[in-house]
Structure formats: structure tokens, C-alpha cells
């Protein structure tokens, strides 16, 4: 069904602190827990999943650029860059790879500055507020769209 698809999972700043950073907002799972679970799901779907996390905007942009011609779909939790990064937006537009924006928390139930995303209007879809399960939904949605 999904043979040979390559999906890139990108996680932005401070997500390396998951499990200990504001667990009442982001949950108790670590980023490694989420990635391991998603990798197992990807394997079951016969999809190659590559993961990269960085606290540096330029490193995420470089990964997006390198994905051009090599990746079929991007799943991205841009974290705080959601609300600030025109550069990340331009990189995603530049490579023309479909992507799904993911947020662990419901950004619309939080501070007003979190209500704006520079990425949502160019994303295939946005998943927020469903915790780590949102990553699974995004993976399945990407595979469905590619199949």
C-alpha cells in the first residue's frame, strides 16, 4: 500500500525537553518515546520515517532543503517557530513537499501570541491539542494522501 514512501518528521525548539517540561501542558512522554512509537507505526505501514529535532531554526531549514527530491511528506511540530518563523515558511514553500503541522497542546486555548501560525495556511492539515496521538494521526493522514 505505502511501499517506498519516505516521511520526514521534524521537531522544533524545546521539544527535546518533553517529559519534564510543563508536563501538564505537553504530557509525560519524552520525544524519544514519541519517535519510537511513531517509527514502529511507520514500519507497520511500510514507510521510511526519518526524524530530526533541533532548537536552531537554520538546522531545520537545512533539513527541509535537503528533503527536496528525497522525501514524499513532512510532518512538522515547529514548536515556538510556528509563531515567528517566516524563514521556515519560505523553506517549506520552496521545496514544495506537502506537510502536516502538529502541536501537542491546543495552541488556541493558550496565550494569544500562540494563536497565529506562519505555517497553517500552507499546510495540508493542522493537528493540535491531541497530545502525542496527534503524531500518529498525522502519519496515517500522510500515508493515506500518498497512497
Curated annotation (Swiss-Prot):
This enzyme's EC code(s): 4.2.1.10
GO molecular function, one term: 3-dehydroquinate dehydratase activity
Subunit and partners: Homododecamer.
Pfam family, one: DHquinase_II
Purpose of the protein: Catalyzes a trans-dehydration via an enolate intermediate.
Stored Gene3D superfamilies: Dehydroquinase, class II
Keyword Lyase listed: yes
Keywords in alphabetical order: Amino-acid biosynthesis, Aromatic amino acid biosynthesis, Lyase
Protein name: 3-dehydroquinate dehydratase
GO BP annotations, alphabetical order: amino acid biosynthetic process; aromatic amino acid family biosynthetic process; chorismate biosynthetic process; quinate catabolic process
Lineage summary: Bacteria, Pseudomonadati, Pseudomonadota, Gammaproteobacteria, Enterobacterales
Protein residues bound to substrate: 77, 83, 90, 104-105, 114
Site residues by UniProt (Transition state stabilizer): 21
InterPro entries xref list: DHquinase_II, DHquinase_II_CS, DHquinase_II_sf
Protein's UniProt keywords contain Amino-acid biosynthesis: yes
Amino acid at each position: 500500500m505505502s511501499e517506498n514512501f519516505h516521511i520526514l518528521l521534524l521537531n522544533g525548539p524545546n521539544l527535546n525537553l518533553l517529559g519534564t517540561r510543563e508536563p501538564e501542558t505537553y504530557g509525560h512522554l519524552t520525544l524519544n518515546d514519541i519517535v519510537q512509537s511513531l517509527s514502529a507505526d511507520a514500519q507497520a505501514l511500510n514507510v521510511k520515517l526519518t526524524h530530526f529535532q533541533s532548537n536552531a531554526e537554520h538546522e531545520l531549514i537545512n533539513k527541509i532543503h535537503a528533503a527536496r527530491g528525497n522525501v514524499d511528506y513532512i510532518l512538522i511540530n515547529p514548536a515556538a517557530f510556528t509563531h515567528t518563523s517566516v524563514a521556515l515558511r519560505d523553506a517549506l514553500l520552496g521545496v514544495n513537499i506537502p506537510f502536516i503541522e502538529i502541536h501537542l497542546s491546543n495552541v488556541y486555548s493558550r496565550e494569544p501570541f500562540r494563536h497565529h501560525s506562519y505555517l497553517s495556511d500552507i499546510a495540508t492539515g493542522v493537528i493540535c491539542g491531541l497530545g502525542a496521538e496527534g503524531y500518529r494521526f498525522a502519519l496515517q493522514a500522510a500515508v493515506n494522501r500518498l497512497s
